[in-house]
Amino acid sequence: MSLYLCVFVSGVESYGVDAGAYSDFNRLRHYIAQHLEDGKPGFRFPNLILHSDCEGEWRPEDCAALRDELARIIEAMCERPATDFPPGWQVALAQSLHLAPRNAMESFIDVDGEPLLVGLLGLAETAIQAGEPILFQ
């Protein structure tokens, strides 16, 4: 099952990110917990790591903290070495788009081959500006 995250403004989708399968999103969260939180999930980034992907949304009042966490995560992951894409659609997409991650941040992509964390940051910024939630669909 695919995880699509989006922000609607006045009933129209304003920004969306297809993260791939729930397992792909959880792979990102697992990496962050292991490498940036010393194996203590939610210790440094509770809004991203501890939020259930079944809860349906990040509320507007949570999006500023989420944005700040994502900015710190992006900065830290840009300093870490790249990891391999998991077998399957990500490897195939990376080959077709000639993607060669230079760091860990670029090693986690959405279904368009864009860095997933950058897309999530864009969602948080859009949600803050619009005062709307980020929806899990």
What residues fall within each predicted segment?
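Acidic (Asp/Glu-rich) sequence patches and key acidic residues
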Residues: M1-Q137
